[in-house]
Amino acid sequence: MCPVWLLVAVVVVGGSRGAVSQCWEHPSCQELNSDSSMMECIQLCHSDLTAEKPVIPGNAHLQPPPLPDPSSSSSFILPSSSSSSSSPQSKRSYSMEHFRWGKPVGRKRRPVKVYTSNGVEEESAEVFPGEMRRRELASELLAAAEEEEEKAQEVMAEEEEEQKQLLQEKKDGSYKMKHFRWSGPPASKRYGGFMKSWDERSQRPLLTLFKNVINKDGQQQK
């Protein structure tokens, strides 16, 4: 009976005295004679009593902590370790890609390529609206510059044609200084009127000149 009493002492140390006394007074445990059967009976009775233990009302910190179950503790420890190992990975993989500031500054986002029906790749304007706007402005400026160049080339071609026509006219006809005022003056005004013919001029000034000379000679002789 010594092992039985040792078992009872261990149970008394591990549990409360009221529960052990209840299990010892239980008729199913009193009818047993072997040590192993009595040990099993006391363990079963103690587990039943602890399962039926009432919850003490009041603050949660004043209630006694629940007894840990070895089978359940291992099952709880494994998920926690797995969750702790998976939590950094999940936090690491999460990134706010739906915001523009979700990515770090040094890392550039790749533009989304849209394949049109013609098979040409076009970048979506939702990813980089500023960049797309700048490209549109650059294309507009290039188109305006090309139009100005075309107009300048047309003007130069017209000027060259006019110069060719002028050269052809000079070769065919006589040279006329149309860009001077005296290019084509009337005959009466050429050289101040000294180049008139004898018929065109009046003979009265010459006659008066002769008369004046004769009169002067007569006066000197007197």
Curated annotation (Swiss-Prot):
Residues covered by region (Disordered): 56-98, 148-170
InterPro entries: Mcrtin_ACTH_cent, Melanocortin_N, Opioid_neuropept, PMOC, POMC-derived_peptides
Main location: secreted
Keyword ATP-binding: no
MF GO annotations: neuropeptide hormone activity
Localization (cell): Secreted
Annotated TM spans: none
Stored PANTHER family: PRO-OPIOMELANOCORTIN
Family to which this protein belongs: Belongs to the POMC family.
Entry protein name: Pro-opiomelanocortin
Gene transcribed to yield this protein: pomc
